[in-house]
């Protein structure tokens, strides 16, 4: 069977410290219910510099400059001064970390309806920095001209615009796109322009770092957790086409796929199916980050005298292509899914996502070398009381292996060590869900000693208040054997002709009798 392959991946982080206070929902909610809170007063003292963000080991892992194994060798917590990565660079093997001023310029470049305004002096400097960028420098030409600060202040005070800040100062705004449509108000437009711009950055990095010809991309599936539309269709879309337009994918179309945190794995399976079926040759899944989740666990971090670690937007892009005999294959016949009948018990959930597809392929849990689950950074989640999320997932998988008599109970810790990884991804919902390992998996399954991995995505659908059901899907990726079908199989049209000729011969035979 000719399976599709994982051809390349790109990962980006965008340091947005000012958006924590002004756009993260933990902070914006606090401003409403308790505007004089000690938390809001102390928060600015707990913001990290761009240099500290770049030198943070989990961030270096996210962009491919450090392996998960190397990160796991560093004792936690990772945020302390003595754990900074010496000589850390903003550019990595798999992507990059972008500073806030460059990103604000990229947001302006992503604006095609003249909704983003910036103060003249600020945007001139930010535009110059963006123009020097090795991957998206060409987009600086699309940055809007600056205006006087008074015009921005007027938009905020009279027309309900949303402010954009840098180093604590007002430098711009996002205007509303409609006078009364809440789906096009300034708050929504800011969120959507941020997810678009960070998605563009991720897609551009995928293209640049994997020598992808954007003109050969057929289809893009955008799988973030935002929605764009208007009052008549608030989730109508389409981020995917918007990303394609900005990254030179002139022959691509696309659509948006949603599933909360499980969205990226749903998109990965859909991309694999589209390529496997022959509908498209090259399909990209991509997503930008969520401003709402910035500083989500900030109260706990400040309470424990930590820096605010949720200070970056995340983004990623993955290319799925036809079998090239080299890159890892996606086993479209080994797909796990949490069905309506599965239920929400942890054992049932993990069983449906891990055990069921492996059994279908005659495999054991221990036959998978590495599992990529919810790869949240425990530096963020443990102080907030959420524990080590990846480790908890691995222990549940190990427990299933114990129940299946594949390992002994005493071997659970060893299983977690061998088949698991420490978490390194930001808590941006869809961003840490399964996909952060794909960039490493491509290397591990081609140049390394890994032969089989499983990408697992899980989602909490109850957040949308439409169902109490849980969700999740998974897919196995394997080392490529190098065998590629020649494509000499008989086509449907040829089969029809053969049947017609056989029927004709049969009819002639009957007439002869």
UniProtKB/Swiss-Prot annotation:
Transmembrane region(s): none
Gene3D superfamilies in UniProt: 3.40.47.10
Cysteine-cysteine disulfides: none
Keyword set, alphabetical order: Oxidoreductase
A single MF term (Gene Ontology): glycine reductase activity
Catalysed reactions, as listed in the record: acetyl phosphate + [thioredoxin]-disulfide + NH4(+) + H2O = [thioredoxin]-dithiol + glycine + phosphate + H(+); acetyl phosphate + methylamine + [thioredoxin]-disulfide + H2O = sarcosine + [thioredoxin]-dithiol + phosphate + H(+); acetyl phosphate + trimethylamine + [thioredoxin]-disulfide + H2O = glycine betaine + [thioredoxin]-dithiol + phosphate + H(+)
Top-level EC class: oxidoreductase
EC number: 1.21.4.2, 1.21.4.3, 1.21.4.4
Protein name, UniProt field: Glycine/sarcosine/betaine reductase complex component C subunit beta
């Amino acid at each position: 069977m000719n399976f599709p392959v994982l051809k390349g991946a790109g990962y980006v982080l965008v340091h947005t410290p000012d958006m924590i206070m002004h756009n993260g929902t933990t902070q914006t909610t606090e401003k409403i219910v308790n505007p004089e809170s000690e938390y809001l007063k102390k928060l600015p003292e707990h913001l990290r510099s761009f240099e500290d963000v770049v030198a943070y080991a989990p961030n270096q892992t996210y962009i491919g400059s450090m392996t998960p194994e190397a990160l796991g060798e560093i004792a936690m917590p990772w945020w302390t001064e003595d754990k900074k990565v010496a000589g850390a660079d903003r550019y990595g093997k798999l992507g990059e970390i972008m500073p806030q001023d460059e990103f604000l310029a990229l947001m302006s470049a992503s604006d095609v309806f003249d909704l983003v305004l910036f103060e003249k002096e600020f945007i001139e400097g930010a535009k110059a920095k963006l123009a020097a960028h090795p991957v998206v420098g060409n987009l600086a030409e699309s940055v809007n001209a600056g205006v006087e600060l008074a015009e921005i202040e007027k938009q905020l005070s009279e027309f309900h615009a949303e402010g954009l800040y840098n180093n604590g100062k007002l430098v711009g705004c996002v205007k509303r796109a409609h006078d009364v449509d809440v789906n096009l108000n300034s708050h929504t437009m800011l969120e959507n322009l941020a997810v678009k711009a960070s998605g563009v950055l991720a897609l551009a990095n995928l293209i640049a770092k994997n020598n992808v010809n954007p003109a050969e991309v057929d289809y893009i599936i955008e799988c973030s957790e935002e929605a764009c539309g208007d009052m008549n269709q608030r989730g109508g879309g389409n981020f995917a086409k918007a990303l394609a337009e900005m990254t030179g994918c002139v022959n691509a179309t696309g659509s948006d796929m949603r599933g909360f945190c499980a969205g990226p794995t749903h998109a990965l399976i859909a991309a694999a199916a589209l390529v496997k079926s022959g509908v498209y040759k090259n399909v990209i899944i991509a997503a930008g980050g969520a401003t709402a989740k910035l500083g989500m666990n900030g109260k706990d971090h400040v309470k424990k005298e930590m820096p605010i670690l949720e200070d970056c937007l995340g983004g990623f892009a993955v290319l799925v292509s036809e079998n090239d005999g080299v890159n890892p294959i996606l086993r479209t016949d080994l797909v796990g899914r949490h069905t309506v009948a599965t239920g929400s018990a942890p054992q049932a959930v993990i069983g449906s996502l891990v055990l069921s597809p492996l059994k279908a392929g005659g495999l054991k849990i221990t036959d998978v070398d590495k599992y990529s689950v919810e790869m949240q950074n425990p530096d963020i989640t443990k102080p907030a009381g959420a524990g080590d999320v990846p480790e908890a997932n691995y222990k549940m998988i190990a427990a299933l292996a114990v129940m299946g008599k594949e390992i002994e109970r005493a071997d659970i810790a060893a299983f977690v060590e061998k088949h698991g990884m420490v978490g390194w991804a930001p808590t941006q919902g869809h961003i840490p869900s399964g996909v952060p390992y794909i960039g490493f998996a491509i290397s591990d399954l081609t140049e390394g000693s890994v032969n089989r991995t499983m990408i697992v995505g899980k989602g909490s659908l109850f957040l949308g208040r439409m169902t109490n059901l849980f969700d999740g899907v998974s897919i196995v990726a394997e080392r490529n054997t190098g065998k590629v079908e020649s494509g000499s199989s008989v086509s449907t049209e040829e089969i029809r002709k053969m049947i017609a000729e056989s029927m004709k011969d049969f009819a002639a035979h009957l007439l002869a009798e």
